[in-house]
Regions:
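Conserved Rossmann-fold SDR core element
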Residues: 155, 165-181, 228-235
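Short, flexible catalytic-loop segment of classical short-chain dehydrogenase/reductase
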Residues: 40, 140, 176-187
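Conserved glycine-rich cofactor-binding loop
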Residues: 15-17
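Conserved mid-core segment of classical short-chain dehydrogenase/reductases
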Residues: 85-104, 186
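Catalytic Tyr-X3-Lys loop
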Residues: 96-116, 154
Length: 242
């Protein structure tokens, strides 16, 4: 029997990109899923598609940036074994040219939003479980200032949480992908997206960007490997080696 057959897994931000692909893989592996999304209609469509894989999936509308709804979400859901958080934004601009509020918001959306999620999740996760957050890899401090701080803060946060939750044998890790072509960029001009992809392909040592499947498999790996704790797994093709 697959060891995920009896496991309840929550994915915050599971209607597109890495979250959706992770959901598909976990359903194939027999897990019971609760996924969230901000858009009710999109969430319903995705749940319908996922039920073609397995009926063991449910959806909850959630805007994680609103603390009252975040608190209510965790109060209402059943206890779970694993959680994946895709929460966090992105930004461009250096420390001198980006608006102060833009930098501050980028940090808030990465560190403090995920810290709130961690605190609520700690009360609902079963012993021997795992919390997985999303950081980022390969950005430059001079053109992604707030995002860099936020991503580094996630790595520090998971180390602290891993120790604090170790008495309950709960692991805490993060996945840090570099730029990947996902629906996150759907509102950007196609030519601009192509230029960004070309830039990263020419910069990454492997000569290309990652696929959604390659990144999402890291979340699955961290769920299934029960001896990885307090780590941030960089999925960047060696970009941070440069």
């Amino acid at each position: 029997m697959n060891e995920l057959n009896t496991k309840h897994i929550v994915i915050i931000g599971g209607t597109s990109g890495f979250g959706l692909q992770s959901a598909k893989t976990l359903l194939v592996k027999g897990a019971k899923l609760t996924i969230t999304g901000r858009d009710k209609n999109k969430l319903e469509t995705i749940i319908h598609e996922l039920k073609a894989i397995s009926e063991t999936v449910a959806g909850k509308v959630l805007d994680a940036s609103k603390e009252d709804t975040l608190k209510q979400f965790f109060e209402e859901i059943e206890n779970f074994d694993f959680m994946i958080s895709m929460a966090g934004g992105f930004m461009g601009g250096g420390f001198l040219d980006a608006p102060y509020e833009t930098i501050k918001n980028a940090i808030d959306e990465k560190l403090f939003l995920n810290l709130k999620i961690a605190r609520y999740a700690a009360n609902k996760i079963n012993d021997n479980g795992c919390l997985i957050f999303t950081a980022g890899s390969g950005g430059r401090a001079d053109n992604a200032s707030g995002a860099i701080i936020g991503n580094e803060s996630i790595s520090i946060m998971v180390k602290g949480l891993a120790i604090e939750l170790s008495k309950r044998k709960i692991r805490v890790n993060a996945v840090a992908p570099t730029w990947t072509k996902t629906p996150l960029w759907r509102n950007m001009n196609k030519e601009e997206v192509k230029n960004i992809e070309t830039y990263f392909s020419n910069t990454i040592p492997l000569g290309r960007t990652a696929t959604i499947e390659e990144v999402s498999s890291a979340y699955i790996f961290l769920i299934e490997n029960s001896f990885i704790n307090g780590q941030t797994l960089k999925i960047d093709g060696g970009l941070t080696l440069l």
